[in-house]
Swiss-Prot record:
Belongs to the protein kinase superfamily. CAMK Ser/Thr protein kinase family. Smok subfamily. May play a role in sperm motility, especially in the regulation of flagellar function. ATP binds at residues 34-42, 57. Keywords: ATP-binding, Kinase, Nucleotide-binding, Serine/threonine-protein kinase, Transferase. Residues 28-275 form the Protein kinase domain. It catalyses: L-seryl-[protein] + ATP = O-phospho-L-seryl-[protein] + ADP + H(+); L-threonyl-[protein] + ATP = O-phospho-L-threonyl-[protein] + ADP + H(+). CDD domains: STKc_AMPK-like (cd14003), UBA_MARK_Par1 (cd14337). It is an enzyme of class 2 (transferase). The keyword Cytoplasm does not apply. Residues 292-332 form the UBA domain. It comes from the Eukaryota. Transmembrane segments: none annotated. This is Sperm motility kinase Z. It comes from Mus musculus.
């Protein structure tokens, strides 16, 4: 009893001390625990220089335990959009820290349980990404060997990330592996038989179990004990619901072939009819090359003390040191900013957009006019002039004007506060005699064949001209502060003499 509690306290102190080493705390701050399995723990941390959150997996460094070292080497090899990215490796005498990107989203297990089962289109989209990542791994000589719903993260947009290569292994073409590993429901027949196995064919079997689970909500081989599951797997007994499409049933049958030699490779599956129905294309390519670093990120890192040559060397040789981590974190932030750039610029609350000509809210009540202000001038912005010219809303020619921009790029348009477009006091616009026509009015007049010819150019009728003439005279009188003599009206009643 005493020894058990002593072991638990020793294990807890070991985990706590793993994240207190100076080499680690100098660069990162621990925020919270994400998961813990024995002496292996994953915590959410913050990078000091950039403030970006990362996932840190701490491993107890033991030279005799090769799988831990193998996981580090495997993560260094891989670079794929559907595989969680390794950013940095910190090695001390006692621990190994794997600094990785945070996989946003939820586990595939939770996603399936919430929906009970996924529709074929959604399952196909997820499966295509899984196949792309696994096909890439096999091309790099890496097998995962622990594919399961808990190790697949799906975000709100349906993007997939495969995590946890702790049971992964490297292999050569034709090489057989012997280590027994994996979740019971995902173990293929050859491993249950204790035979040396082909690593990629084990991943293909696991993909079949995952696909079956996504579209049905249950596992194909179930049992309360390992022996019961083993019996079902070796006999290859499972039911495929008839409500699934014929091509999907065919795909599941190929993936769950009990004979490993009959299972297709990831490359073979590319031409399967069920995958041809989807919109996503399958590629086994890696992430973008960093041989040509971004000059803006290089300049930013130089300002905080990094040397340009050190940055180039770190990226070229993939050292996974502090320099490479800082560059990749800054690049990830820049990509997110670029994705939201247009939206944030267009939705700047401090810079309201130009009001539309047909928007009644743009025409507010006119201010009180002073005697020195003319009343026959209507102000419109350059953007409104351009819109009116396109819609045929005005016939008056406007000189070309340059649109103000922000920064050096002509694509980065700067929003301007639009002037209030209003009609001044004692003036109004009549659609019958005005030269200021909106697009909706032009459409209305063009639909009438009898009036289309005259309404398109909006000519001034004699009656309208007399109105404008009186207004212009009144404005000139006000500006010049002069009055014209008025005729006295004859009185109808005269005084008697």
């Amino acid at each position: 009893m005493y020894s058990d509690s002593e072991d638990e306290s020793s294990e807890l102190s070991t985990v706590l001390s793993m994240f207190e080493e100076k080499e680690f705390t100098r660069q990162y701050t621990v925020l919270k625990t994400l998961s813990q399995h024995g002496t292996t723990e994953v915590r959410l941390c913050s990078h000091h220089l950039t403030g970006v959150t990362v996932a840190v997996k701490a491993l107890k460094y033991q030279r005799w335990w090769e799988p831990k070292v193998s996981e580090v080497e495997i993560m260094k090899m891989l670079s794929h959009p559907n595989i969680v990215s390794l950013l940095q490796v910190i090695e001390t005498e006692q621990n190994i820290y794997l600094i990785m990107e945070v996989a946003q989203g939820t586990q595939l297990h939770n996603r399936v349980q919430e929906a009970r089962c996924l529709k074929e289109d959604e399952a196909r989209s997820i499966f295509v990404q899984l196949l792309s990542a696994i096909g890439y791994c096999h091309g790099e000589g890496v097998v995962h060997r622990d594919l399961k719903p808990d190790n697949v993260i799906v975000d709100e947009h349906g993007n997939v990330k495969i995590v946890d290569f702790g049971l992964g292994a490297r292999f050569m073409p034709g090489q057989k592996l012997e280590r027994l590993c994996g979740a019971f429901q995902f173990i293929p027949p050859e491993i249950f038989l204790g035979l040396p196995y082909d690593g990629p064919k084990v991943d293909i079997w696991a993909l079949g179990v995952l696909l079956y689970y996504m579209v049905t909500g249950i596992f194909p081989f179930v049992g309360s004990t390992l022996s019961e599951i083993s019996k079902e797997v070796l006999q290859g007994r499972y039911e495929i619901p008839y409500n699934l499409s014929k091509d999907l049933r065919s795909m599941i049958g190929l993936l769950l072939a009990t004979n490993a030699r009959q299972r297709p490779t990831a490359q073979d599956l590319l031409s399967h009819p069920w995958l041809q129905e989807g919109e996503k294309t399958i590629t086994f390519h890696s992430n973008g090359d960093t041989s040509f670093p971004d000059p803006d990120i290089m300049a930013a890192m130089k300002n905080i003390g990094f040397h340009v040559q050190d940055i180039r060397e770190s990226l070229k040789h993939r050292k996974f040191d502090e320099t490479m981590a800082t560059y990749n974190l800054l690049r990830a932030e820049a990509c997110q900013d670029d994705g939201n750039y247009v939206q944030t610029k267009l939705m700047n609350p401090g810079m309201p957009p130009f009001p539309s000509v047909t928007d009644s809210g743009a025409f507010s009540l006119p201010p009180r006019r002073r005697a020195s202000e003319p009343s026959f001038k209507v102000l419109v912005s350059s953007t409104e002039e351009h819109q009116l010219r396109q819609t045929g809303g005005t016939n008056a020619p406007f000189p070309p004007k340059k649109t103000p921009t922000m920064g050096r790029s002509q694509k980065q348009k700067r929003a301007m506060t639009a002037p209030c477009i209003c009609l001044l006091r004692n003036t109004y616009i009549d659609t019958e005699d005005s030269s200021f026509c909106t697009s909706s009015q032009a459409e209305k007049t063009s639909s009438d064949p009898e009036k289309s010819e005259t309404s398109t150019s909006c000519p001034l009728t004699p009656r309208g001209w007399r109105k404008w003439k009186k207004r212009i005279v009144a404005c000139i009188q006000t500006l010049c502060c002069c009055t014209l003599p008025q005729k006295k009206c004859p009185r109808s009643v005269h005084p008697q003499k």
